[in-house]
């Protein structure tokens, strides 16, 4: 578990999940797939040589199978590997709505970003978590602590990861990110692990800065100048619409609407002469999914001691008990010329017209 915790994000490229969504998607993979390739490839020898834990030496002949670590870092199955039962019950501690990863990044990112996400009683959640015959289980006495934690995750998501300025930067980066990485990496990371390992935020920003300062290649120079504009926060997209809804009133199917679908429906509701205007959209349920608690698909297993019974709850169902608002849809444009037409179209698409 210590090794899996240490290496669970080893497959991340520069700019984390943005890299997944705007480069790795080309091959239908994500950082977990790359991480597994690293763990079972270049790192396998190092993992296999470990002979002790912080508490004691391993028994004679006892070693860590790198496949155990690779299995734990992702919810998808590891091809050709049948996990022993003891390993399968450990995975939810690293992958799930109240995983160790989630309980680590919420207070950490809240502190670093200067955003008060509210109290998070991690110790109570840990105290009342146990392994039952059904897997990782949370005693109902910790239910309120879990609600606080999920609410803090949602608050942090909207105030930091899905903040309007963050998303404006993301929209602008999306235009230059893929061609930049193609020049620096040159293909599928699984086929270029050596290059992938040295590709970091620092190396990327250093390279594009050099391009902007006078590359002989026109494409590199243009990309470098575009990156320089982002770094200087010369942002071209402006937020002109944001649709909110209460968690308990999320429209049926809203969480499955993609950016492309929302944009297409908006164009259908615009006057014919405006259907080709430039705008960008954001859908909270589809963007930054790794940090979005609304997109959790795993059930949480609760134990009810008075009834000696178990019940399963989806995260979204738990949110519907909380008085929280969610920003689901946004529209960005380079200016406000067609602001009222876009707002009218958005209200019609979302069924908010009065």
Identify the role of each PLM range.
Residues 1-5:
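Active-site alpha-helix of zinc metalloproteases
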């Amino acid at each position: 578990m210590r090794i899996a915790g240490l290496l669970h994000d080893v497959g991340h490229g520069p700019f984390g999940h943005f890299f997944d969504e705007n480069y790795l998607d080309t091959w239908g993979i994500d950082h977990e797939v790359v991480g597994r390739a690293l763990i079972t490839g270049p790192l396998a020898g190092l993992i296999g040589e470990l002979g002790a834990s912080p508490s004691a030496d391993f028994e004679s002949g006892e070693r860590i199978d790198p496949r155990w670590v690779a299995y734990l870092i992702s919810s998808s199955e590891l091809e050709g590997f049948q996990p022993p039962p003891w390993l399968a019950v450990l995975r939810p501690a690293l992958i799930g709505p109240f995983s160790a990863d989630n309980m680590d990044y919420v207070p950490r990112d809240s502190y670093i970003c200067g955003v008060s996400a509210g109290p998070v009683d991690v110790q109570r959640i840990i105290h009342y978590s146990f392994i039952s015959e059904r897997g990782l289980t949370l005693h109902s006495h910790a239910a309120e602590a879990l609600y606080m934690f999920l609410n803090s995750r949602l608050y942090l998501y909207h105030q930091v990861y899905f903040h309007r300025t963050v998303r404006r930067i993301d929209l602008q980066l999306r235009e230059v990110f893929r061609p930049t990485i193609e020049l620096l990496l040159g293909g599928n990371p699984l086929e270029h692990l050596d290059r992938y390992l040295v590709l970091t935020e620092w190396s990327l920003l250093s390279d594009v800065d050099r391009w902007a300062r006078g590359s002989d290649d026109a494409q590199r120079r243009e990309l470098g100048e575009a990156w320089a504009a982002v770094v200087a926060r010369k942002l071209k997209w402006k937020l002109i619409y944001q649709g909110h809804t209460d968690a308990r009133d999320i429209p049926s199917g809203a969480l499955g609407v993609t950016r492309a679908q929302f944009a297409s429906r908006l164009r259908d509701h615009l006057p014919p002469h405006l259907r080709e205007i430039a705008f960008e959209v954001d859908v909270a349920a589809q963007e930054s999914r790794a940090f979005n608690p609304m997109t959790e698909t795993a059930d949480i297993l609760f134990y009810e001691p008075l009834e000696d019974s178990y019940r399963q709850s989806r995260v979204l169902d738990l949110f519907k008990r909380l008085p929280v608002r969610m920003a689901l849809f946004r529209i960005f444009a380079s200016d406000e010329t067609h602001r009222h037409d876009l707002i009218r179209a958005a209200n019609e698409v979302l069924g908010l017209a009065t």
